[in-house]
C-alpha cells in the first residue's frame, strides 16, 4: 500500500505546483511514483483500471483518480484529456501501466501480441499525444517519463510479447525526445530490472528472490522506491538537459 502523503509540504518541495498524470498509478511502481511525486508537492492524477486501489491511492496522495481501459484507444484519449483538463494542464506525464504474459514465442498468439502492444506501447503514444498538445499550448515545456524494462535491452525467454513491446517503448521515447525537444519537452525511459512489488512478493518464492538477487552486484532485488527515486530526478529541473535516454535501474544487472 502506498502510504498517505502528509499535507505539510515545504516550499522547497522539488515538484511544487507541478501537474502530473500517472498511468498504472494504482499500485506497484506507478503507485510509488504517484506517492513520491505528491510528497514533493505535485498534484497527481492517476489513470488505472483498478478502481478501488486507484481511488484509495488517489485519496492518499491528495490527487484524483480516473478509471481507464488502455485497450480502448478512444477511452484512453478521452480519459487522459479529462485528467489534464481537471488540473488545468499537465507538466509531467508518467506512463507506468503495462502487462506481462508469460509464453514462449512458439505459443504466442496474435491476441496476446496485440493486447500487449496495445497496453504497453500504443496506449503510451496516445497519452503522450494528448499531454504534449497541452504542453505545447501552454508553452512551458514538460517532462515525459516512460517505463520500459531491462527486457528491452536483454530480451527475456518465455516472456512473450513483453520484451519487444518494451523495446518499442525505448524507440518511441527517443522519437518523442527528437520531435518535441524544440518545445522544451524532455522524454526519457526507465528500464527497471527485477523489482519486488507487492504483487511480486506475494507470488514469488524465497528461492526465486534469492536467485534473482544473486544477479545483481548489490545482492538484492530492487524496490519500487528505487525506481521512483530516479523518476523523481527525471521529473525535476535537475534533469533539464537529459533527454532521449533509456536509463537502467537494475542494480547492475545491465551495465550499458
Residue ranges and their predicted role:
Residues 128, 165, 173:
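Active-site helix of classical SDR
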Residues 104-105, 112-114, 200, 212:
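Substrate-binding pocket helix/loop in short-chain dehydrogenase/reductase
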Residues 181, 186, 242-244:
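Short, small/polar-rich loop/turn modules that mediate ligand/substrate recognition or access, typified
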Residues 133, 178-179, 240:
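Alpha-helical segment proximal to the catalytic Tyr-Lys
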Residues 2-12, 154, 232, 243-256:
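Short C-terminal tail/terminal secondary-structure segment
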Residues 13-44:
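Canonical Rossmann dinucleotide-binding motif of NAD(H)/NADP(H)-dependent dehydrogenases/reductases
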Residues 149:
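Residue(s) in the substrate-gating loop at a strand-loop-helix junction
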Amino acid at each position: 500500500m502506498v502510504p498517505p502523503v502528509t499535507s505539510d509540504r515545504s516550499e522547497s518541495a522539488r515538484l511544487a505546483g507541478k501537474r502530473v498524470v500517472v498511468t498504472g498509478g494504482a499500485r506497484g511502481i506507478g503507485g510509488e511514483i504517484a506517492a513520491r511525486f505528491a510528497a514533493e508537492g505535485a498534484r497527481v492524477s492517476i489513470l488505472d483500471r483498478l478502481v478501488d486501489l486507484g481511488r484509495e491511492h488517489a485519496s492518499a496522495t491528495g490527487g484524483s483518480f480516473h478509471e481507464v481501459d488502455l485497450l480502448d484507444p478512444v477511452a484512453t484519449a478521452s480519459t487522459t484529456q479529462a485528467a489534464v483538463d481537471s488540473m488545468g494542464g499537465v507538466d509531467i506525464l508518467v506512463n507506468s501501466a503495462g502487462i506481462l504474459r508469460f509464453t514462449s514465442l512458439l505459443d504466442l498468439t496474435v491476441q496476446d501480441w496485440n493486447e500487449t502492444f496495445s497496453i504497453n506501447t500504443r496506449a503510451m503514444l496516445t497519452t503522450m499525444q494528448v499531454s504534449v498538445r497541452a504542453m505545447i499550448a501552454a508553452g512551458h515545456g514538460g517532462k515525459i517519463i516512460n517505463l520500459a524494462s531491462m527486457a528491452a535491452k536483454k530480451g527475456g525467454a518465455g516472456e512473450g510479447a513483453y520484451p519487444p513491446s518494451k523495446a518499442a517503448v525505448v524507440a518511441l521515447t527517443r522519437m518523442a525526445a527528437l520531435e518535441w525537444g524544440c518545445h522544451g519537452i524532455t522524454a526519457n525511459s526507465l528500464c527497471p530490472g527485477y523489482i519486488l512489488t507487492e504483487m511480486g512478493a506475494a507470488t514469488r518464492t524465497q528461492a526465486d528472490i534469492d536467485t534473482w538477487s544473486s544477479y545483481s552486484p548489490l545482492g538484492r532485488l530492487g524496490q519500487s522506491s528505487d525506481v521512483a527515486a530516479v523518476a523523481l530526478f527525471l521529473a525535476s529541473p535537475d534533469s533539464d538537459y537529459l533527454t532521449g535516454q533509456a536509463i537502467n535501474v537494475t542494480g547492475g544487472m545491465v551495465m550499458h
